[in-house]
Amino acid sequence: MSQFSNNWDNKKGPGLGDKLMGRFNNPGPLKPRLDQATRQIQTVMAKLDTAVLKLRDRDTYLFNKIVASVQKRDNQRASMFANELAELRKMSKMVTQSKLALEQIVLRLNTVTELGEVVLTLAPATSVVRNLREGLAGVMPEAEGEMSEISGLLSGILVDAGSVTGTSLNFETANEEAERALAEAAAVAESRMKDKFPDIPQSIPDSNEMEMA
């Protein structure tokens, strides 16, 4: 029976993996801890969904204000609302990117079947969570604490899994994978933003231009 089986659900007697884990004051078998991490990530994802909806409502409000100001030739107010909307959309992109990146982490955690895969999966995942925590701090301060807990939980599992397998962590490779994952999430978020949100109006055609059209 593999070490992974012994350390996965802790239903069998202690094996080599269990003994090794004991040396490092193992706080519990891996599977329940991975499940806990998954649940915590999903909780944050639900909050991100709620944040996206609120940001979308605010986006619609500001966009309509810009249109009304442009129609009234009130460029000063139009510019004020446009600047606020631009900042709001940066926040929306960050929140959407975070949600997408966390979705990928959950998918990978749910497909882990071997102990060695835990290390390969969690190394970049932990780096992604750290980056997202920093990015969300200025957008959703209330999520920072939860992201810190998730980061700590994943780091603990990563260390314990690495101890059992004797796998040395390649932080450079993990960081590169994390950067790729974040870049992919950012690209998808940008695409979704373009699909869902109209361009910010700068001006409207005058009556002569409309008649010629």
Predicted region positions:
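Long C-terminal interaction segments enriched in charged/acidic composition
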Residues: 1-50, 119-213
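Extended, amphipathic, non-transmembrane alpha-helical segments
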Residues: 54-62
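Hydrophobic side-chain positions on well-ordered alpha-helices
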Residues: 62-69
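Residue-level signature of catalytic and energy-coupling elements of molecular machines
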Residues: 73
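Solenoid-repeat scaffolds in large eukaryotic assemblies
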Residues: 77-78
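Amphipathic alpha-helical coiled-coil segments
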Residues: 88-108
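A cross-kingdom feature marking charged/low-complexity
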Residues: 109-121
